[in-house]
């Protein structure tokens, strides 16, 4: 049977599990979009290709399924770059069909020509051009296999003349991939058991590589009487119903997670590529298990490293572990976690404050959201409030830009997740700067009938950048934002829109917003002076904040300094 190359690519992708393709149409993409129209795959028409990259990556990451996006030649496919960088760093298998000019006109001086192979080489696991029609099946199969096996973005560059060329095609081709079992040698597992059995104050630090090892992890913690801290990417899998949980560490962590890691004498790292060595203990014995060999000892020296799947390794390890009886370190760590959560809670006092604190907003969302809701958050302060205050329960999921650290990811990711999970509540915690960057794709919500809920943390500034400037002792420069009334703007676009400025009105507004049957925007005016306090405040940060306060007064900006002190420390 003969089919054109575009139809062959679409057929292979569909047979390999792709349900949705995000993008904007263009002339070099016409045969691809025609093939999608004739298939069971759905086309999601975004207003900016970057949004398509974010959306496809979010769908893939949370669903575990291969997803696609497609763009026209030149600027069209180039616009995907930041969204796909995020997806690639997050380990989301996504296929990009980057359509290209006719093979006879691909030189660097020709209008709209872009060398996609050079552009996408750093943010993909596979990037190849189909140089002749007979290579279409091979390239497409290799792209799918690479995306699934290596967990990343695969790029198929498709010249327009090749897309419409016909080739012989069998009835059905699909690529199926199964993850192999990787288990360390028995001698290495025995050595790991010896280290853990000798430890007195053992701590476990679990990353996203532990997501399938929850049962074995809790059994190990019980035997070792070991508290468990977790990375932000492991929150969904480790945090809930966990009597050993002490929370996160790092810049966006909390006191109990930070303290446990600093005070343990033996630290077991499980499936984590945590990047900040200053949060590791200074004198502890550190052992590590990771399925990726390159991660072992990458961020901090370790005494013993095992290359293997975390769950498979723990199942082999458990019979070799002694049942410890001294639970003093565990008990103190868990007690501190409970006190830390009580200390940072705003549920009781938030409505009585003189401004809306974003922590209170986050806790109200946590209180009233569905038990299986999916949350996204923009990189920056919105990310901190989501990770600290949204509680997981084994059903909820959270997603933000942790490895790439981009702005403007939350709303696009929410669109992709609502498309993938139409019956689940999807809530985006967007910064005002992040949302404004890709504001046009609110129209995608109405056009595609995607009933996502967009909360805007409107502090009228690039808040996280402003905080970084203040910690350095600098005046906050060029971070102010002149925002429209996002509530009225949403209403003008045909969706629910409401703005809230008073703390006492916030809870009712959150309930109305979440219960609305359709796309909705809640514009919440939060304190512009809120500090994202790390779990451990260093002296240089205190000095820097003091310098900022002094400079603000000297430059006639004393009102800013006073507001910062009142909002964060006096909290009237």
Regions found by a protein language model. Give the residues of each.
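Structural signature of the thiamine diphosphate
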Residues: 2, 19-20, 61-71, 75-98, ...
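Phosphate/pyrophosphate-binding active-site segments
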Residues: 4, 134, 158, 169-171, ...
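Active-site diphosphate/adenylate-binding microenvironment
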Residues: 6-9, 17-19, 24-27, 32-33, ...
